[in-house]
Amino acid sequence: MEFDLRPKKLDVYIVTKFITTFFVALFLIIGIVIIFDVSEKIDNFVEKEAPLRAIVFDYYVNFVPYFMNMFSPLFVFITVIFFTSKMASDSEIVAILSCGVSFHRMMVPYIFSAALIALFSLTLNLFIIPDSNKERIAFETKYVKDKTKNVGRNVHYQISPGEFAFAESFSSWNNTAYRFTLERIEDNRLISKITAETAVYDTTRKVWQLKKYFIREYNEDLTDRIRSGKQIDTTLALSVDDFYWNPESVETYNYFELNDLIDLQIMRGDANVKYSLIQKNNRFALPFSAFILTIMGVALSSKKRRGGIGWNIGAGIALAFTYILFMKFSEMFVYTDTLSPAIALWLPNIVFTVIAIVLYRLAPK
């Protein structure tokens, strides 16, 4: 079915109402959320003497885009439900369809608005929010969360091709790896093996201090060279952060940094790569939901109801929260190795796309 795609007053009208309502709802809800968040964290702020400037500029200025993007599906759905229900209640949609505009053609400005919001959300996800998360997470670590001793156990990495590092345990308090081992392998043959009672990272000189070390080099003629000593300094393609993985850290990587991290983790055989893959797929899956929830919202609210817009808004909020919970629940399939991150994180979009198609077909034409 062909229809005229040239911009009309109707398109400008719907796009303006969509975008305006979206941002008004966004900032109203964010204001309420900030009030509740302050009341929840005020004791931490006072107890740990957080400066007012840090609270405002380091935390809440960076908290707003994070929260705004995380709940953007909810805001999109409520926006579409609200102003479309209002249009239906005022018989505007009936008037539009009576003028010869098809239901499909009426959807064009909705899809265009959803595309603008999706592009805005994607830009935030890939480049802006990761930088703002650095300050937000640093603030939470310093003033909100309880400080605990970070200990990594049985850490094993391929730090470079043919070079493997192992530590029985690692303490972030003193940057020390215990029972440290470094192996170098070439052509499936062990070339050398270094063991040390401890490996301490010197933050000033950026070197690892291997204490009570033992070095064994394996030669092709089956003769071994053995050395030992109290301490030796060396540089390794290994950082303190590699020993203790904080899943929140992936939120601070922009698109290109996250791809580099994933490549590095895959090369190392790092099991924590699942967190990075979840983050990467989530950044693309979430903006795409703007299209799905927009179609669902129009299909649900374009018909005039006797009860007014209350039922539509209630149903919209319920479906939006169901989608968000489904997005979070789908991550469990990755943690349990049931599904790959790409399938698990896109599963809610697939399911809700089917629902959107069914609702759209049932909507008034």
Model feature map: region roles:
Residues 159-205, 209-213:
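Structural signature for solvent-exposed beta-strand/loop edge elements and short helix-capping sites
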Residues 196, 228-230:
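N-terminal amphipathic/hydrophobic interface segments
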Residues 215-218:
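Hydrophobic lipid-interacting interfaces of membrane-associated proteins
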